Amino acid sequence: MSSLAIRYHQYGKLQECLVAEEVSLPEIEPDQVHIKLLAASINPSDFGMIMGSYGQKKELPAVAGREGVGEIIEIGKNVNHLKPGQWVQFPESLGTWQEACVIDAEGLKVLPEGLPIEMAATLFINPPTAWRLLHDFVELKSGDWIIQNAANSAVGIFVIQLAKKLGIKTLNIVRRKELKEKLKELGADEVFSEEEEYWKTGPEITGGKGIKLALNSVGGESAINLIKGLSPGGTHVTFGAMSFEPIRFPTRQLIFGDIKLAGFWIDSWMRSHSQKEVDTQFENIYALIKEGTFSTIVEKWYSLSAFKEALEHAAQPRFGKILFRGEE
């Protein structure tokens, strides 16, 4: 058996490092399963992994991709808790940008029936990140305000969707003005572009309530402006650095505004919490999908063989996810 896989043999720029290769799959052992890829996502963290700047480096050569959904097509003779046809989380440890894999059956996450394929493919990073950002740092209640940059990112959209359900008001920052109406259609309360001095009008926008929580995934000047928009005693959480620019935090706000700084990485949260807590997290997400609160916006699907075009598209300004579809 063989499988098409998008691999890298060294760390560096995506277009220079990634190659499509046919890799041999091992014969299935009694305690293993054979999984075919249904769909996989392209995330900013994938770029960082390939460049060697994100998380823990993999042993090379490595298959790219951190997130995806697969279907079990064969089980080993000792496997009795799984069956062909079930959807499972495609193993991140093996890389998700490949047509198929063979892996131990123990520990595979089985997905509930009825999930839209685009939601199943984007389930494991951004939805739990959005949930934790709104639940773990500040006690928020209906009517409270938060502010976030990169509001059109996958996490940003999930934050808007979840905040709307919880009654939390969102002040959203984007780079392109044409995205304002699209985000408002999703439930965003206020949307500003980066060049607008939104931090000066915060009290007016919020009716004097102020802003308790800032969510930063950009860095640089954008992150600093979020701090300026926070109310005294507010919390600023950084969970990404898409601009690759350092943050020079304004001393005045830190000292006299009593601003609190925090960082967040969903991988660390998953590792530091019990399996029961992780399972509960995903049960909450499944419920939000079922009721229609969470949905993934897709801009375009690509085959794995068209990975170069897919990555070029993913690196451009857009509204929605770029996804890989597995072969039929």
Segments from the language model and where they lie:
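C-terminal capping/lid region of NAD(P)-dependent oxidoreductase domains
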Residues: 3, 286, 291-297, 308-328
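Mid-domain Rossmann-like dinucleotide-binding core that forms the NAD(H)/NADP(H) cofactor-binding site
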Residues: 123-196
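Short amphipathic alpha-helix with an adjacent loop that forms part of the alpha/beta core around
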Residues: 198-209
